[in-house]
Amino acid sequence: MKHFNLKNIIAAAALAATALGANAQPKGPAWLGNALFYQIYPSSYMDTDGNGIGDLPGITQKLDYIKSLGVNALWLNPIFESGWFDRGYDVIDFYKVDPRFGTNSDLVALVNEAHKRGIKVCLDLVAGHTSDKCAWFKESMQKDTNLRYSDYYIWTDNISENDKKEIEERRKGPNPASDTRGRYVEANAPRAKYYEKNFFECQPALNYGFAHPD
């Protein structure tokens, strides 16, 4: 029997995300062409520990039912450790299952049980940004720019007057943390005054366009 560890699963998630992209070429795993997906938002699926939040063991318990629907692939919304400001899309650690859903071992068990039933499992990989609580971001904000994660984010001391205006407008709003307007966040970190975000202020954009790719 073939077993899978968490790194294998994350690699598969990245592959699926690439293959399903809007501009993807007809490449990738052969099974994807005939896949019939069943999407699960884990928080609202089956809860096995009575805390009111769905979890991975709950999904595993329902695999026979899912199989009976005629699907052959699962798509799980984000399950990685998260600050949970944006329903799991503010990832703290891409290598750890959020405790609300279970453990890394629970994820491996789910994948193995799904594969026994001919069901593939794809994870929603949040590839554009992380949480500002992510260890990568905390290292990147340091003054030393030669650290491993220094260039994982986009920092600057100079932004346009319009960008400054958008920051001020967010600050004056009723809930600045939930305001998605604008491009930059005022950080006043050792590294620089501002960082680029994707959506909310707590979601610093990952840097795909500069030096030192990992």
Regions found by a protein language model. Name each.
Residues M1-I10:
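Bacterial N-terminal signal peptides that target proteins for export
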Residues Q25-H212:
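Acidic/aromatic-lined carbohydrate-recognition and catalytic surfaces
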Residues A13-A22:
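Hydrophobic h-region of N-terminal signal peptides that target proteins for export
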